[in-house]
Protein backbone atom coordinates (compact mmCIF):
# COMPACT_ATOMS: atom_id res chain seq x y z
CA UNK A 1 0.00 0.00 0.00
CA UNK A 2 1.36 3.39 -0.96
CA UNK A 3 0.34 6.62 0.70
CA UNK A 4 -1.35 9.18 -1.56
CA UNK A 5 0.39 12.56 -1.53
CA UNK A 6 3.53 13.73 0.25
CA UNK A 7 4.16 13.16 3.93
CA UNK A 8 6.90 15.67 4.57
CA UNK A 9 10.46 15.62 3.24
CA UNK A 10 12.47 12.44 2.84
CA UNK A 11 11.49 9.00 4.07
CA UNK A 12 9.14 8.77 7.00
CA UNK A 13 8.86 5.74 9.24
CA UNK A 14 5.24 5.14 10.15
CA UNK A 15 3.44 2.19 11.69
CA UNK A 16 0.43 0.53 10.07
CA UNK A 17 -2.09 2.46 12.16
CA UNK A 18 -0.59 5.77 11.08
CA UNK A 19 -0.53 4.61 7.46
CA UNK A 20 -4.21 3.78 7.56
CA UNK A 21 -5.08 7.09 9.23
CA UNK A 22 -3.15 9.01 6.58
CA UNK A 23 -4.81 6.93 3.87
CA UNK A 24 -8.31 7.82 5.10
CA UNK A 25 -7.56 11.53 5.17
CA UNK A 26 -5.90 11.52 1.76
CA UNK A 27 -8.67 9.52 0.10
CA UNK A 28 -11.24 11.98 1.46
CA UNK A 29 -9.15 14.90 0.18
CA UNK A 30 -8.48 13.30 -3.20
CA UNK A 31 -12.18 12.52 -3.70
CA UNK A 32 -13.18 16.01 -2.48
CA UNK A 33 -15.70 14.66 0.04
CA UNK A 34 -17.44 17.33 2.10
CA UNK A 35 -18.14 14.76 4.84
CA UNK A 36 -14.41 14.04 5.26
CA UNK A 37 -12.75 10.79 6.25
CA UNK A 38 -15.87 9.59 8.10
CA UNK A 39 -17.51 9.09 4.70
CA UNK A 40 -14.62 6.87 3.58
CA UNK A 41 -15.01 4.84 6.78
CA UNK A 42 -18.73 4.48 6.06
CA UNK A 43 -18.04 3.19 2.54
CA UNK A 44 -15.59 0.58 3.85
CA UNK A 45 -18.02 -0.44 6.63
CA UNK A 46 -20.86 -0.96 4.14
CA UNK A 47 -18.63 -3.06 1.88
CA UNK A 48 -17.42 -5.09 4.89
CA UNK A 49 -21.00 -5.94 5.85
CA UNK A 50 -22.55 -6.44 2.43
CA UNK A 51 -19.76 -7.56 0.06
CA UNK A 52 -19.91 -8.12 -2.83
CA UNK A 53 -21.91 -4.93 -3.35
CA UNK A 54 -22.51 -2.57 -6.27
CA UNK A 55 -21.48 1.09 -6.28
CA UNK A 56 -25.14 2.11 -6.45
CA UNK A 57 -26.01 0.05 -3.36
CA UNK A 58 -23.04 1.53 -1.49
CA UNK A 59 -24.29 5.03 -2.33
CA UNK A 60 -27.79 4.19 -1.11
CA UNK A 61 -26.60 2.74 2.19
CA UNK A 62 -24.09 5.52 2.91
CA UNK A 63 -26.39 8.28 1.55
CA UNK A 64 -23.53 9.69 -0.46
CA UNK A 65 -23.70 10.92 -4.07
CA UNK A 66 -23.01 8.16 -6.57
CA UNK A 67 -20.10 9.99 -8.30
CA UNK A 68 -18.35 10.43 -4.93
CA UNK A 69 -18.71 6.74 -4.08
CA UNK A 70 -17.42 5.75 -7.52
CA UNK A 71 -14.38 8.01 -7.08
CA UNK A 72 -13.60 6.65 -3.60
CA UNK A 73 -14.01 3.08 -4.84
CA UNK A 74 -11.51 3.69 -7.67
CA UNK A 75 -8.95 5.18 -5.27
CA UNK A 76 -9.34 2.32 -2.77
CA UNK A 77 -8.91 -0.20 -5.58
CA UNK A 78 -5.69 1.55 -6.57
CA UNK A 79 -4.53 1.32 -2.95
CA UNK A 80 -5.30 -2.44 -2.89
CA UNK A 81 -7.97 -1.98 -0.20
CA UNK A 82 -10.75 -3.04 -2.57
CA UNK A 83 -10.99 -5.35 -5.55
CA UNK A 84 -13.51 -5.26 -8.37
CA UNK A 85 -15.50 -8.42 -9.12
CA UNK A 86 -18.40 -9.22 -11.46
CA UNK A 87 -20.77 -9.05 -8.49
CA UNK A 88 -19.43 -5.78 -7.09
CA UNK A 89 -16.85 -4.39 -4.68
CA UNK A 90 -15.05 -6.63 -2.18
CA UNK A 91 -12.32 -6.05 0.37
CA UNK A 92 -8.88 -7.46 -0.34
CA UNK A 93 -6.91 -9.19 2.42
CA UNK A 94 -5.29 -5.83 3.14
CA UNK A 95 -8.72 -4.20 3.14
CA UNK A 96 -10.02 -6.77 5.62
CA UNK A 97 -7.01 -6.12 7.85
CA UNK A 98 -7.69 -2.39 7.61
CA UNK A 99 -11.39 -2.84 8.45
CA UNK A 100 -10.89 -5.19 11.39
CA UNK A 101 -7.66 -3.92 12.94
CA UNK A 102 -7.92 -0.18 12.32
CA UNK A 103 -11.68 0.48 12.09
CA UNK A 104 -12.36 -2.33 14.61
CA UNK A 105 -15.20 -3.79 12.55
CA UNK A 106 -16.37 -7.23 13.69
CA UNK A 107 -20.03 -7.91 12.97
CA UNK A 108 -21.03 -8.46 9.34
CA UNK A 109 -24.82 -8.55 9.50
CA UNK A 110 -27.28 -5.78 8.62
CA UNK A 111 -30.10 -5.25 11.12
CA UNK A 112 -32.34 -3.29 8.73
CA UNK A 113 -35.80 -4.88 8.55
CA UNK A 114 -35.96 -6.95 5.37
CA UNK A 115 -39.76 -6.77 5.27
CA UNK A 116 -40.14 -2.97 5.20
CA UNK A 117 -36.57 -2.20 4.02
CA UNK A 118 -36.20 0.39 6.78
CA UNK A 119 -39.34 2.36 5.95
CA UNK A 120 -41.09 1.31 9.15
CA UNK A 121 -44.37 0.44 7.41
CA UNK A 122 -45.62 -2.24 5.02
CA UNK A 123 -48.41 -2.18 2.45
CA UNK A 124 -51.42 -4.41 3.14
CA UNK A 125 -53.78 -5.74 0.45
CA UNK A 126 -55.72 -2.45 0.37
CA UNK A 127 -52.62 -0.39 -0.41
CA UNK A 128 -51.19 -3.08 -2.72
CA UNK A 129 -54.33 -2.78 -4.86
CA UNK A 130 -53.83 0.99 -4.94
CA UNK A 131 -50.18 0.50 -5.93
CA UNK A 132 -51.18 -1.66 -8.90
CA UNK A 133 -53.38 1.15 -10.23
CA UNK A 134 -50.70 3.78 -9.65
CA UNK A 135 -48.17 1.70 -11.62
CA UNK A 136 -50.42 1.87 -14.68
CA UNK A 137 -50.78 5.66 -14.50
CA UNK A 138 -47.11 6.27 -13.73
CA UNK A 139 -46.22 4.77 -17.12
CA UNK A 140 -48.10 7.67 -18.75
CA UNK A 141 -45.91 10.36 -17.24
CA UNK A 142 -44.16 12.69 -19.71
CA UNK A 143 -40.38 12.95 -20.00
CA UNK A 144 -38.76 14.59 -16.98
CA UNK A 145 -37.88 18.27 -17.25
CA UNK A 146 -34.47 18.40 -15.59
CA UNK A 147 -34.32 22.21 -15.83
CA UNK A 148 -36.90 22.37 -13.01
CA UNK A 149 -35.31 19.51 -11.04
CA UNK A 150 -37.95 16.96 -11.98
CA UNK A 151 -37.14 13.41 -10.98
CA UNK A 152 -40.00 10.94 -10.85
CA UNK A 153 -40.45 8.85 -7.71
CA UNK A 154 -41.36 5.22 -8.26
CA UNK A 155 -45.05 4.22 -7.94
CA UNK A 156 -44.06 2.25 -4.83
CA UNK A 157 -42.63 5.38 -3.23
CA UNK A 158 -45.75 7.43 -3.93
CA UNK A 159 -47.95 4.71 -2.45
CA UNK A 160 -45.74 4.34 0.62
CA UNK A 161 -46.01 8.10 1.18
CA UNK A 162 -49.80 7.86 1.21
CA UNK A 163 -49.59 4.87 3.56
CA UNK A 164 -47.29 6.81 5.89
CA UNK A 165 -49.74 9.72 6.01
CA UNK A 166 -52.50 7.25 6.88
CA UNK A 167 -50.41 5.57 9.58
CA UNK A 168 -49.54 8.91 11.22
CA UNK A 169 -53.15 10.13 11.24
CA UNK A 170 -52.60 12.74 8.54
CA UNK A 171 -54.94 11.34 5.89
CA UNK A 172 -58.44 10.53 7.14
CA UNK A 173 -60.68 13.60 7.09
CA UNK A 174 -57.77 15.91 6.27
CA UNK A 175 -57.39 18.63 3.65
CA UNK A 176 -54.11 17.91 1.82
CA UNK A 177 -52.17 20.12 -0.59
CA UNK A 178 -49.34 18.79 -2.75
CA UNK A 179 -46.86 21.59 -3.35
CA UNK A 180 -45.62 20.20 -6.66
CA UNK A 181 -46.51 16.63 -7.59
CA UNK A 182 -44.48 15.23 -10.46
CA UNK A 183 -44.23 12.10 -8.26
CA UNK A 184 -48.03 11.64 -8.51
CA UNK A 185 -48.40 11.07 -4.76
CA UNK A 186 -51.86 12.62 -5.01
CA UNK A 187 -52.99 9.53 -6.96
CA UNK A 188 -52.64 6.87 -4.22
CA UNK A 189 -53.77 9.45 -1.66
CA UNK A 190 -57.00 9.99 -3.59
CA UNK A 191 -57.54 6.27 -4.20
CA UNK A 192 -57.81 5.68 -0.44
CA UNK A 193 -61.01 7.81 -0.41
CA UNK A 194 -59.99 8.93 3.08
CA UNK A 195 -59.06 12.61 2.65
CA UNK A 196 -61.60 15.42 2.94
CA UNK A 197 -59.93 17.38 0.13
CA UNK A 198 -56.91 16.95 -2.15
CA UNK A 199 -55.33 19.69 -4.27
CA UNK A 200 -52.18 19.88 -6.38
CA UNK A 201 -50.22 23.02 -7.27
CA UNK A 202 -47.64 22.55 -10.03
CA UNK A 203 -46.01 24.57 -12.80
CA UNK A 204 -45.98 21.65 -15.26
CA UNK A 205 -49.23 21.53 -17.20
CA UNK A 206 -48.37 18.04 -18.50
CA UNK A 207 -48.41 16.61 -14.98
CA UNK A 208 -51.65 18.41 -14.12
CA UNK A 209 -53.41 17.09 -17.24
CA UNK A 210 -52.37 13.54 -16.35
CA UNK A 211 -53.76 13.97 -12.83
CA UNK A 212 -57.01 15.34 -14.28
CA UNK A 213 -57.35 12.33 -16.62
CA UNK A 214 -56.70 10.02 -13.68
CA UNK A 215 -59.36 11.75 -11.58
CA UNK A 216 -61.97 11.41 -14.33
CA UNK A 217 -61.14 7.78 -15.07
CA UNK A 218 -60.91 6.61 -11.45
CA UNK A 219 -63.84 8.68 -10.17
CA UNK A 220 -61.89 10.61 -7.55
CA UNK A 221 -61.64 14.35 -6.94
CA UNK A 222 -58.28 16.12 -7.10
CA UNK A 223 -58.22 19.87 -7.64
CA UNK A 224 -55.35 20.94 -9.93
CA UNK A 225 -53.91 24.45 -10.10
CA UNK A 226 -51.22 25.53 -12.55
CA UNK A 227 -49.04 27.95 -10.64
CA UNK A 228 -45.47 29.22 -10.49
CA UNK A 229 -44.51 28.83 -6.84
CA UNK A 230 -42.19 31.81 -7.05
CA UNK A 231 -45.44 33.75 -6.70
CA UNK A 232 -47.76 33.64 -3.64
CA UNK A 233 -50.53 31.03 -3.64
CA UNK A 234 -53.96 32.00 -4.94
CA UNK A 235 -56.07 33.48 -2.15
CA UNK A 236 -58.56 30.60 -2.07
CA UNK A 237 -55.76 28.16 -1.15
CA UNK A 238 -54.42 30.12 1.80
CA UNK A 239 -54.98 28.87 5.38
CA UNK A 240 -57.21 26.09 4.05
CA UNK A 241 -55.23 22.87 4.53
CA UNK A 242 -54.24 20.57 7.40
CA UNK A 243 -51.36 18.78 5.67
CA UNK A 244 -48.96 19.63 2.86
CA UNK A 245 -46.57 17.35 1.00
CA UNK A 246 -43.61 18.50 -1.08
CA UNK A 247 -40.48 17.21 -2.82
CA UNK A 248 -38.82 20.57 -3.60
CA UNK A 249 -35.71 21.43 -5.61
CA UNK A 250 -32.69 20.21 -3.66
CA UNK A 251 -31.35 23.68 -2.83
CA UNK A 252 -31.80 25.60 0.42
CA UNK A 253 -33.68 28.42 -1.35
CA UNK A 254 -35.82 25.86 -3.18
CA UNK A 255 -36.73 24.23 0.13
CA UNK A 256 -37.51 27.61 1.75
CA UNK A 257 -39.75 28.62 -1.14
CA UNK A 258 -41.78 25.40 -1.35
CA UNK A 259 -42.20 25.13 2.43
CA UNK A 260 -43.19 28.82 2.59
CA UNK A 261 -45.94 28.22 0.03
CA UNK A 262 -46.95 25.26 2.15
CA UNK A 263 -47.15 27.54 5.18
CA UNK A 264 -49.44 29.87 3.22
CA UNK A 265 -51.73 26.88 2.72
CA UNK A 266 -51.53 25.71 6.35
CA UNK A 267 -51.79 29.00 8.20
CA UNK A 268 -50.34 29.14 11.70
CA UNK A 269 -50.00 25.39 12.27
CA UNK A 270 -50.10 22.06 10.50
CA UNK A 271 -48.18 19.05 9.21
CA UNK A 272 -45.68 18.99 6.35
CA UNK A 273 -44.19 15.95 4.63
CA UNK A 274 -40.82 16.86 3.16
CA UNK A 275 -38.88 14.64 0.76
CA UNK A 276 -35.30 15.78 0.28
CA UNK A 277 -31.88 14.48 -0.70
CA UNK A 278 -29.24 13.48 1.83
CA UNK A 279 -26.73 16.32 2.24
CA UNK A 280 -23.26 16.94 3.76
CA UNK A 281 -23.27 18.22 7.34
CA UNK A 282 -22.76 21.91 6.46
CA UNK A 283 -25.68 21.92 4.01
CA UNK A 284 -27.80 19.88 6.39
CA UNK A 285 -27.25 22.44 9.16
CA UNK A 286 -28.50 25.18 6.82
CA UNK A 287 -31.55 23.07 5.99
CA UNK A 288 -32.33 22.38 9.65
CA UNK A 289 -32.02 26.07 10.51
CA UNK A 290 -34.34 27.01 7.66
CA UNK A 291 -36.92 24.45 8.82
CA UNK A 292 -36.84 25.46 12.50
CA UNK A 293 -36.83 29.19 11.70
CA UNK A 294 -40.16 28.66 9.95
CA UNK A 295 -41.65 27.12 13.08
CA UNK A 296 -41.39 23.44 12.16
CA UNK A 297 -39.81 20.67 14.20
CA UNK A 298 -38.61 17.46 12.57
CA UNK A 299 -40.71 14.93 14.44
CA UNK A 300 -39.61 12.03 12.27
CA UNK A 301 -37.07 11.40 9.52
CA UNK A 302 -36.80 8.14 7.56
CA UNK A 303 -33.65 7.75 5.41
CA UNK A 304 -33.86 6.04 2.01
CA UNK A 305 -37.66 6.17 2.06
CA UNK A 306 -38.03 7.56 -1.46
CA UNK A 307 -36.74 5.88 -4.60
CA UNK A 308 -36.61 7.54 -8.01
CA UNK A 309 -36.43 6.49 -11.64
CA UNK A 310 -33.00 7.23 -13.10
CA UNK A 311 -31.70 9.75 -10.53
CA UNK A 312 -28.18 8.33 -10.38
CA UNK A 313 -26.61 11.48 -8.95
CA UNK A 314 -28.53 10.99 -5.66
CA UNK A 315 -28.24 7.18 -5.92
CA UNK A 316 -31.99 7.12 -6.68
CA UNK A 317 -32.94 7.70 -3.04
CA UNK A 318 -33.88 10.49 -0.58
CA UNK A 319 -35.34 10.76 2.92
CA UNK A 320 -38.83 11.72 4.00
CA UNK A 321 -39.39 13.90 7.06
CA UNK A 322 -42.61 14.59 8.95
CA UNK A 323 -42.60 18.19 10.15
CA UNK A 324 -44.94 19.51 12.83
CA UNK A 325 -45.51 23.26 12.72
CA UNK A 326 -46.78 25.82 15.20
CA UNK A 327 -46.71 29.63 14.92
CA UNK A 328 -45.46 29.14 11.39
CA UNK A 329 -43.57 31.90 9.61
CA UNK A 330 -42.82 32.32 5.91
CA UNK A 331 -39.10 32.46 5.11
CA UNK A 332 -38.38 32.97 1.41
CA UNK A 333 -34.83 33.32 0.12
CA UNK A 334 -33.60 33.93 -3.44
CA UNK A 335 -36.45 32.92 -5.77
CA UNK A 336 -34.35 33.27 -8.93
CA UNK A 337 -31.94 30.42 -8.19
CA UNK A 338 -34.06 27.71 -6.64
CA UNK A 339 -33.06 24.93 -9.05
CA UNK A 340 -29.88 22.87 -8.76
CA UNK A 341 -28.73 23.68 -12.29
CA UNK A 342 -28.69 27.40 -11.46
CA UNK A 343 -26.96 27.04 -8.09
CA UNK A 344 -24.45 24.37 -9.17
CA UNK A 345 -24.30 24.59 -12.97
CA UNK A 346 -22.67 21.67 -14.76
CA UNK A 347 -21.90 20.56 -18.28
CA UNK A 348 -22.71 16.93 -18.97
CA UNK A 349 -21.17 14.90 -21.77
CA UNK A 350 -23.33 12.21 -23.34
CA UNK A 351 -22.27 9.47 -25.75
CA UNK A 352 -24.68 8.45 -28.50
CA UNK A 353 -25.27 4.71 -28.15
CA UNK A 354 -25.83 4.41 -31.90
CA UNK A 355 -22.76 6.12 -33.39
CA UNK A 356 -20.57 6.98 -30.41
CA UNK A 357 -20.51 10.76 -30.93
CA UNK A 358 -20.06 12.87 -27.79
CA UNK A 359 -22.58 15.67 -27.10
CA UNK A 360 -22.50 18.51 -24.54
CA UNK A 361 -25.63 19.24 -22.52
CA UNK A 362 -26.03 22.35 -20.38
CA UNK A 363 -25.26 25.19 -22.76
CA UNK A 364 -27.16 25.36 -26.07
CA UNK A 365 -28.95 22.08 -25.33
CA UNK A 366 -30.30 22.40 -21.79
CA UNK A 367 -31.45 18.83 -21.14
CA UNK A 368 -30.68 15.39 -22.51
CA UNK A 369 -34.37 14.83 -23.29
CA UNK A 370 -34.02 17.38 -26.12
CA UNK A 371 -30.89 15.77 -27.54
CA UNK A 372 -31.01 14.10 -30.96
CA UNK A 373 -27.83 12.92 -32.69
CA UNK A 374 -27.12 13.58 -36.37
CA UNK A 375 -27.21 9.82 -36.94
CA UNK A 376 -30.80 9.76 -35.68
CA UNK A 377 -29.86 8.16 -32.38
CA UNK A 378 -32.02 9.05 -29.39
CA UNK A 379 -30.37 6.99 -26.66
CA UNK A 380 -27.38 8.38 -24.77
CA UNK A 381 -25.12 7.50 -21.86
CA UNK A 382 -23.60 10.17 -19.62
CA UNK A 383 -19.82 9.74 -19.51
CA UNK A 384 -18.61 12.90 -17.77
CA UNK A 385 -19.71 15.89 -15.68
CA UNK A 386 -17.91 19.22 -15.28
CA UNK A 387 -18.76 21.86 -12.71
CA UNK A 388 -19.07 25.41 -13.97
CA UNK A 389 -18.40 28.53 -11.96
CA UNK A 390 -21.43 30.71 -11.26
CA UNK A 391 -21.37 33.94 -13.21
Swiss-Prot record:
**Protein source organism:** Methanocaldococcus jannaschii (strain ATCC 43067 / DSM 2661 / JAL-1 / JCM 10045 / NBRC 100440)
Q: Using the record for this protein, list the coiled-coil segments as residue ranges, or answer none.
A: none
What's a single GO MF annotation on this record? transferase activity, transferring alkyl or aryl (other than methyl) groups
InterPro entries attached to this UniProt entry = BpsA, BpsA_C, rRNA_MeTrfase/Polyamine_Synth, SAM-dependent_MTases_sf, WH-like_DNA-bd_sf, WH_DNA-bd_sf
Q: Locate the transmembrane regions by residue number.
A: none
Lineage runs: Archaea, Methanobacteriati, Methanobacteriota, Methanomada group, Methanococci
Q: Which SUPFAM superfamilies match?
A: S-adenosyl-L-methionine-dependent methyltransferases, Winged helix' DNA-binding domain
Q: Which processes are annotated in GO (biological process)? A: polyamine biosynthetic process
The identity of this protein, by name, is Uncharacterized protein MJ0675
Amino acid sequence: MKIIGKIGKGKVEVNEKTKFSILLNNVAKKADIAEGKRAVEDIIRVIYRHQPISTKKIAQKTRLPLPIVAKVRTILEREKILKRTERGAELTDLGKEFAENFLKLKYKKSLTCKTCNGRGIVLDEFFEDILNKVRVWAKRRPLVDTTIDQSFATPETSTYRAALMYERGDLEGKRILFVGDDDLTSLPTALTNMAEEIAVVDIDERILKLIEKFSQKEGVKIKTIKHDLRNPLPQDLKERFDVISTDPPYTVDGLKLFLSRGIEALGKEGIAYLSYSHKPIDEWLSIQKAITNMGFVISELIPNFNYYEGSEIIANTTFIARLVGKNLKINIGDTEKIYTGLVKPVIRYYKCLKCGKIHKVGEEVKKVEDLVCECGGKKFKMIKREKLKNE
